[in-house]
From Swiss-Prot:
Belongs to the bacterial ribosomal protein bL21 family. The gene is rplU. One of its GO terms (cellular component) is ribosome. This is Large ribosomal subunit protein bL21. PANTHER family: 50S RIBOSOMAL PROTEIN L21, LARGE RIBOSOMAL SUBUNIT PROTEIN BL21M. InterPro entries: bL21-like, bL21-like_sf, Ribosomal_bL21, Ribosomal_bL21_CS.
């Protein structure tokens, strides 16, 4: 079984392993810089670690590959019988991370 971890960033949790490319909420750092992510769970073969004291010693490091945007989301609000229409669009800013190590 492979080693993987559950990391928390941007209010979400992601399952990552070494070498994975993960799209996460935007992180304010330059591409090429290294970041450390907080760990919620580590699985190493048959061993599952959830103890907060042991997880404090575990570090998941990653390298920022690029900043990008997610797909276009279209919002349309409509009120009946009043002529109210509101169209709005949104593209979430994302960061592509390459996981370099789980130690």
């Amino acid at each position: 079984m492979a080693t993987y971890a559950i990391v928390k960033t941007g209010g979400k949790q992601y399952k990552v392993a070494v070498g994975d490319l993960v799209k996460v909420e935007k992180i304010d750092s330059e591409p090429g810089s290294s970041v450390q992510l907080p760990v919620a769970l580590v699985v190493d073969g048959a061993t599952v670690t959830t103890d907060a004291d042991k997880l404090a010693k575990v570090a998941v490091t990653g390298e920022i590959v690029e900043h990008t945007k997610g797909p276009k989301i279209r919002i349309h609000k409509f009120k009946n019988k009043t002529g109210y229409h509101k169209r709005q669009g949104h593209r979430q800013r994302l960061t592509v991370l390459k996981v370099t190590g789980i130690k």
